[in-house]
């Protein structure tokens, strides 16, 4: 028929599933509206899907128009479901408008728009219209008129562009970035509806409508709606319009409520007029779809005059012209222009609904022809009314002599108001009032009229109250139902619509029906069937709604994650791939063994499909039928109920006519219904009590009645009825399941009753009865049945096992293996699983062959620990191996394992899959190759439990843990001891001789009692407290355990033979890599010796307290800080050593030394976090020395051991980072890091990123600054502290985020003033020392501090030669007693100190100060001096770190604020605690990292036992390098920990071992471009100095002396950014040992830092050195070939080693931050970052490195700098830098303000950092490269200091970029990227202005100075 309307729905699927319900509802509402308007037969529709983002979609199945009907709608829904799935696809190049236009064109051309109907067009339609028949033509005309000519329509269901920006993107797509101007309407029209499309639409009478499906949240957040109105305007030209989606679903008010409920924060809460919800949806659609003149004629507009109140002093009354449009067709129209007089305002007015008071409503608007000013005023009035929720009271003069009418004006929208005119039916009322008013004098008219208004309003309220009270009472159930829905409005029918088809009757309503039926007293006569039907319906609806919500929730969660995140799965995510494969294979094998039939029940799929608490519909229907015999009755009193129940009970028992379970169910439900009808609170509890008191009998009471009952059948029947009653109780009162005790009692009682049945009858009868119970209740209460079977001791039947929740068996793992006493019963025996007695190896072999042969019919069975989310108790299963077998097979326990060659571990990992099955089959000789610990498995208790009770009895007493240390379960995961024991006790039987079940959290005391060195004790302690279940990846834990046990066994030997481990340069440099034992031994020995002297008391304090403090700090970033701390320490040591041996060292050595110094600073700088933390650590330790001293005398000692200056530098920041709590330095940094993270992820990120960078920067700057300060002291000492403070102040704001970076240079106080300053302010340094700064504070402080520290580290080396020489002298001279050292330190640092004093904050934290005032070199230097002093104490500090760190660390944050005095205090404290060391360290730090190192070395040499010696050891002792190497794997943290532990030993060792064997390492550039390490034996005396230096370098820089190791670390970090995060130590290792460890890094990055970072890192630091921190080091060494591979590319990829770390950090910073959250991770990142630059330097080699470094200074902070690095061949570094920069920027974006501070810091720090890094990266790296064979160093022979200086200062380094210009450029770059970031903070601007100079000066001058010093 010609009059048939064709409707096309064109749906955009780009929005995804989020819009599914919105689109569905809009389509359904639209079709319903059209079918109501034209008739079902007159509307034919089709639908088409397209993707406006360009994703390809399959063609729609429906190819032509169809009639409206359920079938076509079902097709639509099906297609919609399939299309609107969440799928990831990137937007294509073409804009959305193009795709939309293409889809529209296809729609117009592909469909038959004008095809006539099949029925004859001439046949008239018999439709009565009045009294005539309509022919086709007249019908068509009428139809056209009906909807304003609407014949055919296309409805586009897609999000409509709202803002101008969205419109631009819609039209231009990817080009929107380049195009700045908004598109003109013409452009939009040409893109969307070009002329050809419009012509086709006109020809086919098609109107185009756009149904906007934009999400609410986006709608409210849109800045403007210009795009929306532009589209509206365009569509109006063709007769169409935009239809808001709320027209089809909810009103605005509801939408607003939904938004608020969903937690979406709107910038401003939307003010929605109640009128919007009053208007029916059909009215809205009519208005939108009708454009015909006829429609508008139904609502004629008229003009009116709005008279505003007369203002005082004005005689003329202002008037506005308005238009009035009736809202309804039936209301009376005014006859002439209406006059409206405003009288006042009223609040809380609602539309009256009184029957006596009628209302007419008119829409008031401002006419288009009125002046713009008036329109604006009108809109302001409307918005004011809306905002204040006011209404205006007005008099309306209708004219024609009629009296004025009272009206109320309410806001409707932004430009319209509603005038509601009250018209009463009694006209007399108004007449009377008016007559009275006329009678009165004119003066009284106003007041009288106000009285009239009041009286009218009062009457309105009275009438409302009357109608409310008079209204017939609404039934309670109806009110309840209405209460569950939103308030019903006049559009109630419209509102019901969206719910009726989707939800049906609500569960609340059905529950009310049940109540109605149960509560009505006069329904006795109602049929039994009807009552049962209502009851069953109610139950069905309620259960169905529950099931739907459950399934929907499960589907949602399924969509969110593909696989369940079980604890085991999460744990395995941290493992290396081979281990992961091994564990999955092992667990799945066990699952296969448990379910050989391949039933996938174990996978937990059935748990999802079954609703634990609900019966299926079929079962309900069955029950409904059975119930009809017992009618639920209505009882008035409880007595009636009880008598009925007892009568029923006795009748059932006596006659047996009624089915027992039906009777039981009926009785329980009757009681429940009765209590419900009484409105009982706690219904289920009361119901249970009622049933227990009146119905339940115990088996004891039944037995006592046995004598009375002669009838055995009655007795059995009663027992069965009691069983059913209890089961029904569990079913109908689910609350009983929540109480374990109640459930146990019920199960116990049922068990007793069943046993009575079995005794009375026989087991076969019982089996039959159990089958019946199973059939009835398996779907509803499977867990109860499972418990029942367990209680009876029966094997759980297969069908029940399949239904049980997946976590059922992990609670009682023995259920399926239990021997059943009733195995003779057929149904039981058939279901029982056979228990295989064959050894596990046979089973594995059998499984292996079977799985290979078997076809894949069934889905892979996954082990519960992998497949199930709910896992109650995890255990460690340790296979019990007899001692004999162990001996035979050479499977030695952990203690001996360290002696194994590293290759063993490699082989084990490599052959992991094969060994899984072959382990038992290997010959003893082969097995000896992998005599690692028997792998401990964390599995569900279900696995591999066999009944070998005989053997167990023999072996039970002999079970011995093969693992000496088991990581402590994190507090938040710990199960109460009582519950744990109860669970284990509740297991049906002992696991058996094979399996030892170890509780997850063994007593801590056991660990302590183990005989081991203090350092190891700390390590194990921290390990015990580590947050990870497996300290790291399993491989690592094995190696660590091996080392650990080995160390335990050999701890004494180690003490005696520290040197013995250093046999050759190779072992020295790569010992940790090649031999787990020797490095660890070395470290252990060194550590032990030192720890005995200094660390013995300190280490325990630091590391023992760490348990708690570590945990606390770790809670933030425990691991990272520690690592960072250690790393800083190592660097500090290195500097000392370097300083000490610079003079003695050859240029190469010096370079190496420098590098190592750099490295030490670079660690902080390389890995921003590291540097941040390290500096902090140093500061903290120094500063902490004081605070710690106050806090823990022991710790202070340690701190003393560690350079106070260093401590302040590192420690303070560290403190800030970690928390005063963390005992170990590393921990504190972590804390601070964690704290910032806590403070705000973004800020943390910024701090972490920027801070890492900033830290790095700052660290560098600080180090540099220290150096600079030395240099500057001479050159710029004059620069007042105030100046520095100013600088600091400028930077501070930025420091807020990365306070460390820029702010640190600034005066700490000022910093505190700034965001960082604020933090600092919160806890002044002094205060900080005592109190831990707030997390934020710590964070900010940390950044500041660490930069200082880093700077001091770096700076010291470059520091003025005099200082260097001074330090050297100090180094050379045996360290004076602590007091002397302190004095010396003070002397050395006096200028700095004075500076520090001038800048209390800066001086307070030498490191911090430096960081604070990188710009103020003098201050920095002073700080650095302090730091230098501190460096010597680093070893001590290490020991001290834990406790001291905590205080210091916090203090360090305060330190920034603290005055010089504090610094002095720290120094003095350091002195007290090994001031000699501290002093030397501090001095070395002050003069330069080299000096510091030298000092430390000297100390170590002079006083092997003195803390100073530890510092020296750390930096310079050969042992230390070994350990460093060892640490490398772990990362700087390990290194630091090693140093801390080894410092005394190391120093001592360096003294001892240095003389016996000293090696000179030179980096040589080969033609291939790879660096070559040349190791020469050196004169023992010089060697002593040089070696300690190199060692310190290697340990400190891990790049200088152990360049190879250091590099590999870097490379590792590079190769595995994740590892970097995972285990900062690893990254560091990677960086340090790219050559050898590099490959490992990739493989082993599984340092398991994931855990390590959070909790392991601290252990790493602590035990990282002695233990093999990561599997990397421990067992798997990369083949030499791989190690020797050029790493340039990889480094670049990874972010250029340290760069990589940085890059990784930067690129992954967001993620990295989260990773960094774990202390270790943060540290790792920083380390990795620091290391990475070194790697790149390796690659740069030679001169290239220097230039590279130089630019990197800026480059690190800036992309430009990065690019300059790239120019030098540091492309990788550049990438890293860029990545990091990007990450930083991302962080900045996240937190602009913070970022700004951070950026400024980062930038300022960056320059200084880069300068610092430069020395560290450029010089140090060059040296490191030289030192490290793997790195490719361009320097063939050692560069002379002068040559290096020349290179450094060469313009080539800056290639057209002055350092200042470079820094500017980078800054500019930054600004471009984040203009707001840069410009937001004046500080950052100021800093940027200054920074270039300081940076330039720092970089060039510092480098020159540094070189000269060297």
Swiss-Prot record:
Q: Where is the composition biased (Basic and acidic residues)?
A: 545-558, 595-608, 616-632, 1001-1010, 1275-1289, 1489-1500
Write the record's keywords in alphabetical order, separated by commas. Answer: Cell cycle, DNA damage, DNA repair, Nucleus, Phosphoprotein
Residues bearing the modification Phosphothreonine = 1134, 1307
| Family annotation (Pfam families) | Treslin_M, Treslin_N, Treslin_STD
Where composition is biased (Basic residues), the residues are: 850-859
Q: GO MF terms on file?
A: chromatin binding
**Residue positions where Phosphoserine is found in the record:** 292, 441, 599, 820, 838, 865, 923, 938, 1001, 1026, 1057, 1078, 1125, 1141, 1413, 1484
In what ranges is there compositional bias, type Polar residues? 893-902, 1027-1046, 1805-1816, 1850-1863
Asked whether the keyword Nucleus is assigned, the reply is yes
Q: Please list the GO biological process terms of this entry.
A: DNA repair; DNA replication; mitotic DNA replication checkpoint signaling; mitotic G2 DNA damage checkpoint signaling; regulation of DNA-templated DNA replication initiation; response to ionizing radiation
Where does it reside? Nucleus
The protein's matches in InterPro entries, at most eight in alphabetical order, are given as: Treslin, Treslin_M, Treslin_N, Treslin_STD
Residues of the region (Disordered) are 545-568, 595-632, 833-859, 877-905, 981-1012, 1027-1453, 1488-1523, 1580-1637, 1687-1709, 1746-1766, 1796-1830, 1850-1877
- Which Gene Ontology CC terms are recorded? cytosol; intracellular membrane-bounded organelle; nucleoplasm; nucleus
Compositionally biased spans, kind Gly residues:
1694-1704
Please explain the role this protein plays, according to its UniProt record: Regulator of DNA replication and S/M and G2/M checkpoints. Regulates the triggering of DNA replication initiation via its interaction with TOPBP1 by participating in CDK2-mediated loading of CDC45L onto replication origins. Required for the transition from pre-replication complex (pre-RC) to pre-initiation complex (pre-IC). Required to prevent mitotic entry after treatment with ionizing radiation.
Family assignment from sequence similarity: Belongs to the treslin family.
Assembly notes: Interacts with TOPBP1 (via BRCT domains); interaction takes place in a CDK2-dependent manner. Component of the replisome complex composed of at least DONSON, MCM2, MCM7, PCNA and TICRR.
In Swiss-Prot or TrEMBL terms, this protein is called Treslin
């Amino acid at each position: 028929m010609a009059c048939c309307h064709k409707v096309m729905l064109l749906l955009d699927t780009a929005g995804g599933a989020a819009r599914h319900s919105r689109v569905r509802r809009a389509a359904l509402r639209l079709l319903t509206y059209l079918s109501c308007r034209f008739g079902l037969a007159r509307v034919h529709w089709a639908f088409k899907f397209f993707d406006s983002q360009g994703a390809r979609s399959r063609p729609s199945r429906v190819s032509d128009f169809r009639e409206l009907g359920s079938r076509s709608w079902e097709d639509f829904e099906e297609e919609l479901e399939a299309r609107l799935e969440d799928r990831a696809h990137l937007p294509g190049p073409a804009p959305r408008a193009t795709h939309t236009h293409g889809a529209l064109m296809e729609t117009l051309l592909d469909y038959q728009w004008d095809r006539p109907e099949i029925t004859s067009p001439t046949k008239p339609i018999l439709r009565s219209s009045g009294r005539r028949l309509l022919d086709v033509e007249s019908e068509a005309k009428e139809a056209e008129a009906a909807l304003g000519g609407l014949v055919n329509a296309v409805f586009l269901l897609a999000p409509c562009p709202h803002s101008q920006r969205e419109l631009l993107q819609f039209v231009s797509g990817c080009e929107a970035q380049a195009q700045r101007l908004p598109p003109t309407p013409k452009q939009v029209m040409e893109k969307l509806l070009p002329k050809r499309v419009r012509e086709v639409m006109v020809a086919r009478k098609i109107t185009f409508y756009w149904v906007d499906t934009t999400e609410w949240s986006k709608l409210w957040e849109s800045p403007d709606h210009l795009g929306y109105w532009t589209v509206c305007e365009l569509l109006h030209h063709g007769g169409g319009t935009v239809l808001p989606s709320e027209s089809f679903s909810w009103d605005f008010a509801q939408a607003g409520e939904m938004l608020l409920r969903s937690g979406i924060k709107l910038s401003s809460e939307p003010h929605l007029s109640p009128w919007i919800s009053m208007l029916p949806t059909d009215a809205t659609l009519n208005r939108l779809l009708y454009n015909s003149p006829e429609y508008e004629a139904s609502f004629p507009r008229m003009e009116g005059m709005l008279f505003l109140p007369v203002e005082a002093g004005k005689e003329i009354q202002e008037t506005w012209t308005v238009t009035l449009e009736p809202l309804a067709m039936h209301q009376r129209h005014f006859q002439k222009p209406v006059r409206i007089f405003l009288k006042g305002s009223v609040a809380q007015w609602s539309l009256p609904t009184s029957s006596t008071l009628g209302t007419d409503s008119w829409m008031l608007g401002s006419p288009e022809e009125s002046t713009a000013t008036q329109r604006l005023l009108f809109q302001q009035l409307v918005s004011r009314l809306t905002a204040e929720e006011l209404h205006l009271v007005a008099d309306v003069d209708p004219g024609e002599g009629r009296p004025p009418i009272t009206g109320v004006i309410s806001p409707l929208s932004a430009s319209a108001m509603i005038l509601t005119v009250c018209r009463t039916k009694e006209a007399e009322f108004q007449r009377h009032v008016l007559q009275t008013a006329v009678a009165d004098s004119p003066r009284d008219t106003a007041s009288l009229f106000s009285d009239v208004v009041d009286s009218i309003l009062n009457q309105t309220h009275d009438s409302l109250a009357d109608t409310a009270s008079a209204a017939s009472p609404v039934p309670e159930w109806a009110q309840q139902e209405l209460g569950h829905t939103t308030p019903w409005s006049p559009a109630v029918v419209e509102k019901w619509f969206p719910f009726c088809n989707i939800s049906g009757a609500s569960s609340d309503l059905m529950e009310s029906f049940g109540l109605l039926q149960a509560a009505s007293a006069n329904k006795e006569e109602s049929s039994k069937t009807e009552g049962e039907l209502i009851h069953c319906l109610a139950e069905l609806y309620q259960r169905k709604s529950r099931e739907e919500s459950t399934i929907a929730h499960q589907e949602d969660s399924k969509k969110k994650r593909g696989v369940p995140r079980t604890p085991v799965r999460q744990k395995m995510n941290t493992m290396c791939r081979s281990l992961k494969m091994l564990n999955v294979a092992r667990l799945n094998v066990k699952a296969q063994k448990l379910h050989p039939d391949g039933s996938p029940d174990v996978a937990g799929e059935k748990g999802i499909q079954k609703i634990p608490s609900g019966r299926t519909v079929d079962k309900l229907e069955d029950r409904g039928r059975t119930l009809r015999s017992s009618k639920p009755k209505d009882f008035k009193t409880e007595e009636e109920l009880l008598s009925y129940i007892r009568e029923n009970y006795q009748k059932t028992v006596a006659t047996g006519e009624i089915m027992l379970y039906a009777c039981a169910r009926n009785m329980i439900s009757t009681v429940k219904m009765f209590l419900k009808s009484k409105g009982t609170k706690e219904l289920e509890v009361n119901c249970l009590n009622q049933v227990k008191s009146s119905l339940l009998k115990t088996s004891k009471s039944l037995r006592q009645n046995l004598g009375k009952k002669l009838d055995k059948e009655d007795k059995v029947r009663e027992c069965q009825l009691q069983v059913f009653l209890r089961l029904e109780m569990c079913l109908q009162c689910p609350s009983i399941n929540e109480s374990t005790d109640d459930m146990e009692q019920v199960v116990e009682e049922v068990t007793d009753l069943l046993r009575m049945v079995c005794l009375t009858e026989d087991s076969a009868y019982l089996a039959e009865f159990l089958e019946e119970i199973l059939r009835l209740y398996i779907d509803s209460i499977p867990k109860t049945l499972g418990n029942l079977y367990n209680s009876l001791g029966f094997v759980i039947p297969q069908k029940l096992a399949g239904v049980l929740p997946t976590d059922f068996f992990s609670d009682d793992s023995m259920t399926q293996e239990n021997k059943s006493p009733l195995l003779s019963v057929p149904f039981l025996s058939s279901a029982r699983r056979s228990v295989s007695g064959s050894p596990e190896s046979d089973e594995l072999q059998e499984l292996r062959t079977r799985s290979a042969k078997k076809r894949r019919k069934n889905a892979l069975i996954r082990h519960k620990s992998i497949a199930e989310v709910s896992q109650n108790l995890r255990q460690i299963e340790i296979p019990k191996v007899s001692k004999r077998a162990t001996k035979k097979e050479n499977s030695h326990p952990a203690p001996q394992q360290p002696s194994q060659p590293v290759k063993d571990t490699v082989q084990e990992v490599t052959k992991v899959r094969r060994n899984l099955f072959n382990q038992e089959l290997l010959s003893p000789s082969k097995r000896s190759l992998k005599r690692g610990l028997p792998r401990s498995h964390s599995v569900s208790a279900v696995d591999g439990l066999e009944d070998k009770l005989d053997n167990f009895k023999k072996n039970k007493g002999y079970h011995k843990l093969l693992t000496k240390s088991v990581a402590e379960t994190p507090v938040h995961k710990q199960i109460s001891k009582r519950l744990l024991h109860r669970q284990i006790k509740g297991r049906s039987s002992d696991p058996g001789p094979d399996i030892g079940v170890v509780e997850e959290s063994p007593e801590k005391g056991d660990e302590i009692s183990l005989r081991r060195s203090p350092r190891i004790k700390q390590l194990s302690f921290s390990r015990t407290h580590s947050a990870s279940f497996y300290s790291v990846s399993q491989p690592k834990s094995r190696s660590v355990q091996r080392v650990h046990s080995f160390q335990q066994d050999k701890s004494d030997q180690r003490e005696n033979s520290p040197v013995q481990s250093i046999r050759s340069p190779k072992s020295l440099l790569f010992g940790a890599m090649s031999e787990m034992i020797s490095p660890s031994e070395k470290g252990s020995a060194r550590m032990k010796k030192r720890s005995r002297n200094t660390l013995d008391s300190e280490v325990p304090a630091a590391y023992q307290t760490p348990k708690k403090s570590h945990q606390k700090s770790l809670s933030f970033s425990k691991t990272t800080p520690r690592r960072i701390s250690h790393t800083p320490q190592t660097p500090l040591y290195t500097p000392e050593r370097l300083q000490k041996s610079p003079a003695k060292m050859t240029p190469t050595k010096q370079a190496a030394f420098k590098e190592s110094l750099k490295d030490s600073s670079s660690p902080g700088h390389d890995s921003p976090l590291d540097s941040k933390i390290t500096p902090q650590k140093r500061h903290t330790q120094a500063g902490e020395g004081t605070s710690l001293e106050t806090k823990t005398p022991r710790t202070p000692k340690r701190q003393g051991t560690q350079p106070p200056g260093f401590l302040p530098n590192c420690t303070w920041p560290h403190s800030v980072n970690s928390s005063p709590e963390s005992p170990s330095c590393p921990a504190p940094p972590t804390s601070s890091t964690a704290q910032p993270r806590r403070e705000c992820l973004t800020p943390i990120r910024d701090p972490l990123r920027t801070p890492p960078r900033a830290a790095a920067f700052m660290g560098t700057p600080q180090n540099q600054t220290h150096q600079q300060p030395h240099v500057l002291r001479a050159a710029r000492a004059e620069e007042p502290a105030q100046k520095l403070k100013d600088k600091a102040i400028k930077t501070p704001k930025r420091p807020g985020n990365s306070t460390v970076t820029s702010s640190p240079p600034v005066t700490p106080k000022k910093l505190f003033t700034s965001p960082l300053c604020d933090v600092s302010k919160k806890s002044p340094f002094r205060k900080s020392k005592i109190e831990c700064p707030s997390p934020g504070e710590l964070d900010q402080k940390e950044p500041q501090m660490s930069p200082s520290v880093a700077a001091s580290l770096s700076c010291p080396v470059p520091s003025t030669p005099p200082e260097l020489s001074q330090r050297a002298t100090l180094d050379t001279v045996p360290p004076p007693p602590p007091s002397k050292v302190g004095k010396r330190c003070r002397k050395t640092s006096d200028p700095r100190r004075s500076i520090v004093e001038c800048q209390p904050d800066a001086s307070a934290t030498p490191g911090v100060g430096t960081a604070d005032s990188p710009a103020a070199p003098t201050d920095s230097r002073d700080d650095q001096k302090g730091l230098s002093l501190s460096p010597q104490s680093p070893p001590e500090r290490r020991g001290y770190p834990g406790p001291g760190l905590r205080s210091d660390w916090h203090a360090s944050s305060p330190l920034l604020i603290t005055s010089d005095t504090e610094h002095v205090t720290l120094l003095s404290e350091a002195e007290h605690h090994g001031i000699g060391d501290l002093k030397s360290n501090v001095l070395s730090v002050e003069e330069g990292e080299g000096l510091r190192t030298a000092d430390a070395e000297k100390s170590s040499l002079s006083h092997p036992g003195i803390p100073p010696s530890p510092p020296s050891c750390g930096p310079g002792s050969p042992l230390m390098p070994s350990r460093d190497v060892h640490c490398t794997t772990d990362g700087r943290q390990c290194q630091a920990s090693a140093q801390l532990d080894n410092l005394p030993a190391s120093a001592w060792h360096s003294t001892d071992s240095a003389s016996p064997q000293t090696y000179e390492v030179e980096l040589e550039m080969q033609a291939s471009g790879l660096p070559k390490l040349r190791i020469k034996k050196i004169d023992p005396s010089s060697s002593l100095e040089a070696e300690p230096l190199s060692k310190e370098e290697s340990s400190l820089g891990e790049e200088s002396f152990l360049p190879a190791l250091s590099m590999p670390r870097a490379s590792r970090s590079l190769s595995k950014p994740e590892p970097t995060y995972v285990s900062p130590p690893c990254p560091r290792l990677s960086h340090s040992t790219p050559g050898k460890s590099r490959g490992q890094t990739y493989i082993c990055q599984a340092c398991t830092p994931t855990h390590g970072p959070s909790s392991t890192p601290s252990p790493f630091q602590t035990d990282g050195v002695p233990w093999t921190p990561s599997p990397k080091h421990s067992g798997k060494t990369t083949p030499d070939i791989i190690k020797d591979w050029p790493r340039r590319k990889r480094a670049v990829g990874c972010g250029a080693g340290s760069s990589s770390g940085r890059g990784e950090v930067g690129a992954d910073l967001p993620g990295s931050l989260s990773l960094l959250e774990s202390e270790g991770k943060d540290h790792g990142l920083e380390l990795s970052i620091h290391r990475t630059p070194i790697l790149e330097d390796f690659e740069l080699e030679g001169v290239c490195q220097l230039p590279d470094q130089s630019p990197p200074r800026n480059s690190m902070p800036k992309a430009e700098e990065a690019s300059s690095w790239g120019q030098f061949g540091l492309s990788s570094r550049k990438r890293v830098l860029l990545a990091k920069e990007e990450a930083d920027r991302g962080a900045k974006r996240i937190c602009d303000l913070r970022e700004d501070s951070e950026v400024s810091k980062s930038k300022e720090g960056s320059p200084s950092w880069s300068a610092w890094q430069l020395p560290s990266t450029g010089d140090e790296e060059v040296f490191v490269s030289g030192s490290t064979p793997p790195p490719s160093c361009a320097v063939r022979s050692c560069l002379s200091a002068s040559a290096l200086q020349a290179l450094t200062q060469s313009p080539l380094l800056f290639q057209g970029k002055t350092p200042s210009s470079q820094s500017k450029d980078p800054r500019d770059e930054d600004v471009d990227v984040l203009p707001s970031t840069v410009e937001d903070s004046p500080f950052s601007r100021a800093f940027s202005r200054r920074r270039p100079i300081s940076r330039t000066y720092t970089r060039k001058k510092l480098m020159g100075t540094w070189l000269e010093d060297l």
